[in-house]
């Protein structure tokens, strides 16, 4: 069976889909974000950039499954906090959803799956858009499934809740989830060390002002909280465009707990639970279900974002499997 992806970024979605489908091409925006990484790992895969230049006629009636990962930023919790819950309606990136969905009409596949963050299904998020697309898909003769899933129950080594809009010509049976307890961060790191030794890969960087506080940061604690213990509010100095506190660490930098499941990966921000450093990119890839030898092109500091912005391979494999069974 044949598949085609849209907005696949570094290629995590394709890694999972390829276990069940022959992937024909990627359709990307222009310029294609992380195209060099996708090319390094799938050198023979055609990648078409720019929605106006997608060769739709070339692939019409030749694709069984279209899988899509349009940008989720319009529905991120951070964006909603700063810009308001309805800001997504004016975000130009939601066009990526329409470009992907329209391939149902243009390619006539047996199925399509579009992934995003759960807030796209919230009444205060993109729910009206989801229902609009649902009605359109049903009029085209497709059955629609709204799938909310935590990736840890598909074999992923961390918790990652995501929404999938799935339209199929045949009945979909989203079953076979594994609800056994997911491995803890400590167990995953031990497994990584047993398989790959001490080579953690590129260690993500911290600022010099953050490093002195690492030894004081407890498991399960934000480095910002640690910093604030040593720097009471009366000592804070604000500056910059948003009036932030100078020298205070990013809120996303947490020291993980060995006894708990790793939370969602949003970049290379996590602090190792037992060593005073951030994670290495190979450790992060292992947590995310990527091969540790996956080739990430571009600046090393971008690898965390490359991993975080896509669909994790184990989740992609699960979605591809249930879609294939429906076909």
Language-model regions, residue ranges each:
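Short alpha-helical segments and helix-capping/turn motifs at coil-helix boundaries
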Residues: 50-54, 148-152, 248-250
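Proline-centered helix-kink/hinge sites
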Residues: 70-71, 109, 157, 291-292, ...
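Short, solvent-exposed polar/charged micro-motifs at secondary-structure junctions
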Residues: 56-63, 155-159, 307
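Core alpha/beta nucleotide-donor-binding catalytic domains of modification enzymes
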Residues: 2-108, 118-128
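S-adenosyl-L-methionine-dependent DNA methyltransferase catalytic core
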Residues: 2-22, 35, 136-140, 162-327
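Redox-cofactor binding/interface segments in oxidoreductases and associated redox assembly factors
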Residues: 67-68, 114, 267
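Conserved Class I SAM-dependent methyltransferase catalytic core
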Residues: 93-167
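Short, flexible, glycine/charge-rich loop motifs used to bind or transfer phosphoryl groups or to couple energy/partner
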Residues: 54-57, 102, 154-155, 252-255
């Amino acid at each position: 069976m044949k598949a085609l992806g849209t907005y696949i970024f570094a290629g995590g979605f394709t890694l999972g889909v390829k276990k069940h489908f022959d992937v024909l091409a990627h359709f990307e925006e222009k310029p294609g974000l992380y195209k060099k990484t996708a090319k390094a790992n799938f050198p023979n895969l055609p990648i078409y950039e720019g929605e106006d230049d997608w060769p739709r006629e070339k692939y019409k009636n030749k694709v069984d499954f279209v899988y899509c990962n349009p940008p989720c930023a319009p529905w991120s919790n951070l964006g909603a906090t700063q810009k308001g819950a309805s800001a997504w309606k004016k975000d130009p990136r939601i066009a990526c959803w329409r470009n992907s969905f329209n391939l149902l009409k243009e390619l006539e596949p047996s199925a399509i799956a579009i992934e995003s963050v759960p807030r796209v299904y919230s009444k205060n998020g993109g729910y009206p858009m989801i229902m609009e697309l649902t009605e359109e898909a049903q009029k085209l003769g497709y059955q629609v499934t709204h799938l909310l899933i935590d990736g840890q129950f598909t074999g992923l080594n961390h918790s990652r809740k995501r929404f999938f809009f799935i339209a199929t010509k045949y009945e979909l049976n989203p079953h076979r989830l594994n609800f056994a307890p997911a491995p803890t961060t400590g167990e995953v790191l031990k497994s990584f060390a047993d398989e790959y030794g001490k080579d953690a890969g590129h260690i993500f960087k911290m600022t010099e002002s953050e490093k002195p506080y690492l030894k004081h940061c407890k498991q399960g604690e934000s480095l910002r909280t640690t910093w604030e213990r040593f720097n009471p509010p009366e000592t804070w100095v604000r500056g910059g465009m948003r009036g932030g506190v100078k020298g205070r660490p990013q809120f996303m930098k947490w020291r993980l707990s060995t006894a708990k499941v790793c939370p969602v990966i949003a970049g290379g921000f996590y602090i190792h639970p037992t060593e005073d450093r951030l994670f290495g990119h190979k450790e992060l890839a292992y947590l995310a279900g990527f091969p540790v030898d996956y080739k990430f092109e571009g600046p090393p500091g971008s690898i965390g974002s490359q991993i975080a912005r896509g669909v994790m391979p184990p989740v992609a494999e699960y979605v591809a499997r249930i879609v294939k069974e429906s076909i």
